[in-house]
Amino acid sequence: MDVLGSIPALADGRLLRRETTTVTYLEPLALSAHPRLRCAFTTRHAGRSGQALNLSFDKGERPAVLAHRQHVLQALGLEQTTLCTVRQVHGNQVCIVDAAMLQRGLTGIAADALVTNLPWVALGVLVADCLPIVLYALDTPVIALVHAGRMGTYHRVAQHALEMIEQRFATPPAHIHAVLGPAIGACCYTLDRRAVGPFQDQFPTWEEFFIPHGPEHWAMDLLTANTLQLRAAGVPTEQIDTASICTACHKHDLYSHRAEGREAGRGMAIVALTSPARVSQ
């Protein structure tokens, strides 16, 4: 249970390395002992096979991607679950994954957050710099997975997910815990005024997560921006766990669109509820 080789004692040990012959992934320490949760942030490594672990159909051949996804689920003990993903559009739409939604299917649904209270249903978002946020409660069987890039952050997607959790599952933000996974850091994410301007107009606290970086340029801190939004929504600071890993700095272990360009593959954040005893389906 060590941290991924080339990533230094990363995030103060908040992520644990897990490896099989086909998958290498990072597990949040905060969730490693949770009896009803499985969670992973995949790396770009297909375990000890030496192959690349791309999980996006847009970036690889469908049979290979399907096999990679199944390997990840197997590594998490979720091989018989449904993996739910949506068409990510950098907005704030939230998809509630209930029995009716599973029956209809999620194909074509545009959203950047998924919420469910169903056991043995895995939620997944693709990432290659954007921030994955896992939301869960200790006293209520409900989980959410959020995809928060620059525009998702602008549209307050994490707050929308929290609102949906409270409305549909009567679980207020004060009862929610959050894990913020690997994402591009301010060290590697410089933006010009055109990109920063909307934040200046809509966020009175914008200077807390934009760092001046030369004339008319700023470095965006996605982790801080979303931490502030979670806190503003009512999630206690002590219930927010942040893994400060920059995907661009560690492009040899994690996918990074900013560092690699349009050809970058995609990793995935995955979270699922289990039940005390596995029931046959």
Give the residues covered by each predicted segment.
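Active-site microenvironment for binding and transforming phosphate-containing groups
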Residues: M1-Q281
